[in-house]
Structure formats: C-alpha cells, structure tokens
Amino acid sequence: IIFSMWLLFSFSESTEYIAGDSESSWKVNFPSREALIDWATRHQFTYSDTVVNEDEDHDCNTKIHSKLGDMVVTKRPLVLPPLITLPLSPSPAPAPNTSGAAAGCGFMAFLEVSVAMLMFLIWL
C-alpha cells in the first residue's frame, strides 16, 4: 500500500495551472513541466512594473498580497525556529555489551521489534 501510494504521488503531475486571484483568475493548460518552465521564463512576474528577484526579496521590504490586503514583510528569518524543543532523553537501545556475556541479546531485541512491526503493517 505504501509503495503504491509513493508511486502514485511520484508520477502525478498537474497539467492545469490557475494564475491570478479569485476575481481575475485564468487557467493555463500545459502539456509538460518543460512547457511551464518556458512559459514562466517568457512571462516574468512584476510588481509595480519592477522585476523583483530573489536577492532583492530577501534584502529589502517586500509587499505580499494576501486575502486581507497587502501585508508588509520587514525581514524573513533564514531558518525557522522549532515550535517545540524536546529535552534529550536516554536512548531506548540497550547499552553495548562489553562483558562478553549474552552476546546476541541486542540483535534478538532488534529482531523482535522488526517482526512485530512487520506483523502490524501486514495487519493494516
């Protein structure tokens, strides 16, 4: 099931693209991704007759259109901070066996967990 879902998502592609907002939207049909790239390079999007590239977008204030109106973004963080920081917990894996006794216990635990997970996936 997981493989078939991956296969479906990896080979699915949209061939209709909607451009514009809800009032003045229009559909563009493209037979392939290369046609979309060619169209985008011929039709550069502008704001107030000024082309805004990626460097200018990160370096200066940029107006972004939203449904509530124009929103001014002053500076975007390069990396978003995590929403939740979890404390470090001890590893659930057993400590390495240095005494020499019962040398295969770690592998047996791994095998039991693997078989249990496989049975759970088959049950789904």
Curated annotation (Swiss-Prot):
Superkingdom as given in the UniProt entry: Eukaryota
Keyword Signal assigned: yes
Gene Ontology annotations of biological process type: nodulation
UniProt entry tagged with the keyword Signal: yes
Signal peptide span: 1-12
Keyword terms, alphabetized: Nodulation, Signal
Annotated function: Involved in the infection process during the plant-rhizobium interaction.
Protein name according to UniProt: Early nodulin-5
Organism for this UniProt entry: Vicia sativa (Spring vetch)
Phylogenetic placement of the source organism: Eukaryota, Viridiplantae, Streptophyta, Embryophyta, Tracheophyta
Gene that produces this protein: ENOD5
